[in-house]
Each structure stands twice: as C-alpha cells, then as structure tokens.
Amino acid sequence: MQISSRSGFGYFSYGIRLALTPGIRRFVVLPLLANIILVGGAMYYLFSHLDTWISEWIGQLPSFLSWLSYVLWPLLALTILATFSYFFSTLANFIASPFNGLLAEKVEQHLSGERIGEEGVWALVKDVPRILSREWRKLLYVLPKALGLFLLLLIPALGQTLGPIAWFLFTAWMLAIQYCDYPFDNHKISFHDMRNTLKQNQSKAYGFGMLVAFFTSIPIVNLFIVPVAVCGATAMWVMEFKTQHSPLRQ
C-alpha cells in the first residue's frame, strides 16, 4: 500500500483512518482499554481540583502582573491538562507497550505489505523484557528534563508565563518520541538513533507531537488517542524514516 509524505499534523489525521481499518481494529482494543482505565480515572481526579490549583498558582503573581491572569488561566489549564494526560498516558503506554508495539507492527505490515517479525503469542511474550527495558530508557530520558521544567515553574512570574509554553513544547517532543519509538524499536533501532532521526526532522516530529498533546488535553477525546497516535507514528516511520534505517533492520 503506497502512502504519500505528509506533515506531522497529516500523519496524526491519517492515524485515525488507520485505527479504523479492518484488520487493524482488533489490535487497537488492548491499548485503548489501558488508556481508558488510567487516563479516565486521572481526568476525573484532575477536574475536581483544577480550578483550585490554577487559582493558587496565579495567586503567586506579583500584583503588577495580575492583569495577566485572564491570559494565563486558559494557558495554564491547557498545560496542566496536557501534562497530566501525558503522565498517565505514559503509565498506560508502559503497561500496554507490548500491545502498542504489536499494533505498530500490524500497521507497518498493512502499509508496506512486508512481514515485520515473528507472529503469535509466544513471539510477543519473548519480546516483553526488551520492550519494557525500552520504556525504562524513555523514562530515564524524560525525568531529568521534566524536573528542570518543574523547577522553572516554581520561579515567580517566569514560571507562570514562560513555564506553560516550555511545558507544552516539551510535552509535544516527548509524545513524538513516545509514539514514534514503537516502529523504530520493532526494527531494533537504538533509542539514540531514533532520537537523532527525529531531531533531523523536527518540523514533522513537533507537528505530530503538538497535535497529540492538544487532543490528549481534551476530555473524552484523550481516551482514544493512544492507538491513533501509534498508527500515525508508524505511518510516519514507513514514509519518512524506514529507508534511512534499512541497513539496520534485522
């Protein structure tokens, strides 16, 4: 099946079509269930506390910047939603990572017509330790940067103005890494090489990640994002990156 090159936004939209494709849909179910359970519970908790958190945070602004509260409230709300959703989506992805990898494999097979690896339950079970190790590698990459940005948020005025923008861009980048990594990992391409490939294609990576971050912050919609993002990221791999790494395939 031939697909044309798209923008990062375009690959996300294409992911919706792929997730609904016959032959792919049955591999969407388990990642979808993990996301609904964890993110759904997190969103319920978040919305019961969101107004209080934002009011307390804006209250730290100096009085001469109080006029910014009208601008910052929606920006902070979006940032908190995106960050909260990213955290719990990451947890859901960690738990469902073997099934996300399987979904990426089936999408690539659908798009390229090539068999990617061994099939069957035993093949999936054998891959679980490697897949979970890869998820830990992502967490080790994320945590120091997330801590630095959290400290930025604690700086009066600066944290309330530049902090939300920095968090949104960081979330977009990390979501691009999170979902694009599944097809890379299926081909045993190192995390370092995957990250460098995305750095060389930042417009597509950020475009894709921003759209995932935006929809991840929308209640109800965010429950269905994981399989869509896996499908879209796999389409990006097939069209944009696969030929660059063909000598590395095993």
Swiss-Prot record:
GO terms for biological process: cysteine biosynthetic process; sulfate assimilation. Its main location: membrane. It comes from the Bacteria. It is a multi-pass membrane protein. One of its GO terms (cellular component) is plasma membrane. It is found in: Cell inner membrane. One of its GO terms (molecular function) is high-affinity sulfate:proton symporter activity. Keywords: Amino-acid biosynthesis, Cell inner membrane, Cell membrane, Cysteine biosynthesis, Membrane, Sulfate transport, Transmembrane, Transmembrane helix, Transport. The chain crosses the membrane at residues 27-47, 64-84, 150-170, 210-230. NCBIfam families: PRK04949.1. High affinity, high specificity proton-dependent sulfate transporter, which mediates sulfate uptake. Provides the sulfur source for the cysteine synthesis pathway. Belongs to the CysZ family. This is Sulfate transporter CysZ. The lineage of its organism: Bacteria, Pseudomonadati, Pseudomonadota, Gammaproteobacteria, Vibrionales. The gene is cysZ.
